[in-house]
């Protein structure tokens, strides 16, 4: 028994038995985590089973697996595929006639990281849609262009919805208080033609004024971009970061007119950074908005315009494979916020 357990799971027999008790030693978990990072399939299967637990340990293990799956944590090549295949096997077991009503399989019948990973692995479209329904429930679009249908939850060219972008960016702001991020908006109201950015800025200026770094996530019709108001040498600046084709002049003028509400008087204080980064990240404008907020959160006192220009320049030097990996991993990291 010692030989079998040690060869399969890198654990001693007492450590293996402890996995089925309420308390699992940090030493045993560390050994399993290390083996999983190195791609050990037996240990991946074992950890996926532990992640089913509805307690702090189960949550910790599930989060560890998802961090590997989404690229937040480094692992062996194809670690994401090994993990989601293990989750898919569990999902199949959870839905057989014997176990489908068992509460121990709760995480595979309700929105969870495990269920999301299982859904990413299945190639059966009807099962994929069934899993997506459990994860997403009923969602409604804030704009006509948003794709909230369940059939494309794992699609690599899916446009992010307002709610998904809001959940992810709110999560980032909680981790870093340096930014104030507003709920995503459309630039122009579809029926009244009201400039919604202008209205929100008027309200903020009338109430408490702008924060040191105030971020607006704006949809121009079929595209997300970042609009940042910040202070540089006690002067308010406005920065628009657009990762697709240049905006048309009407859209630019709407943003400029809204920005002047804050006291900006010179167009030179409004900076448009426009670089197409989406050739290998289709419909990835929301992903870049999320990543931009990450960058700004970690930029400290650096000039935001310099930070974002350098990012855009560096991103274009990445290989197609690296840009594609950014697309896959960032989508997974963003959707995790909607699973919490």
Swiss-Prot record:
Its main location: secreted. The keyword Transmembrane does not apply. The active site is at 223, 285 (nucleophile). It is an enzyme of class 3 (hydrolase). It is found in: Secreted; Host cytoplasm. One of its GO terms (molecular function) is cysteine-type peptidase activity. Keywords: Host cytoplasm, Hydrolase, Protease, Secreted, Thiol protease, Virulence. InterPro entries: ElaD/SseL-like_N, SseL-like_C. GO terms for biological process: proteolysis. Its EC number is 3.4.22.-. GO terms for cellular component: extracellular region; host cell cytoplasm. Belongs to the peptidase C79 family. Effector proteins function to alter host cell physiology and promote bacterial survival in host tissues. This protease targets the host cell ubiquitin pathway by acting as a deubiquitinase in infected host cells. This is Deubiquitinase SseL.
